[in-house]
Amino acid sequence: MCGNGSRCATLLAHKLGMAPAEHLMLTDAGTVHAQVFSEAGEVEVQLTPVRDVALNFSLDLGGTSFTAHFANTGVPHTVIIADDVKALDIKGLGALVRYHAHFAPAGTNANFIQILGREELLLRTYERGVENETYACGTGAAASVAVAHALGLCEAKARVTTSGSEMLEITVRGTDIFLRGKAQLVYQGEFSPAALGL
C-alpha cells in the first residue's frame, strides 16, 4: 500500500476518463476512497482504517533506548519523536528499527518526527523495501499524525512536511484517516512489455 501512489493513481485515472473525480480504488490493503480537487490541484485518499496502534514502548537501537510508537495505516509504521529530525542518521537508525526483532518477521517502516506545533510536523521516513530514506511517505505521514494525535501532541488535522519538502495534510477521524496533497501529471508515455521480454 502506497498512500502517495494511491493519490497519483487517482489523479491519472480521473485525467484519463477512467474514473470520476470521486471514486473507490481497490488495493491489497483494502478499499480506498479517493477524490480529486481539480481547482486546488490536490488529491485526497481515505486510507484503510488505522489499526494495531501501540504507544510508548521501548526499543533498544544500537545500545540506546528510544521510546517508540506504532500504527498500521495499510502498512506497518513505527514512529519515534525527536527534538531535531535533521540531525538524525536516518539510514542507520531506520535500518535498526526496520529489522528490530520486535517487528520480525515482516519488519516495519521507520518514521522520525519533530513536532513543530499543534498542527505542524516534520517527517523523515526509512522505508522497508527501499531500505533507505524516502522523501515523501504518505502512509508514514498518516501513521505519524495518528500517533501524535493519540499522544495529545497535535490536533486531528495537521500538516506534515516531508524531507523532500512535500506538504501533506492528514486528518484523523476515529480510526478513519485521510491523506491530502498536491498531485500533477509530469510525464506520459507508452510501455511495451515486449521490449522487456514480457
Kindly give the residue locations of the regions a language model identified:
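Active-site proximal loop and beta-alpha junction motif in alpha/beta enzyme cores
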Residues: 1-136, 143-198
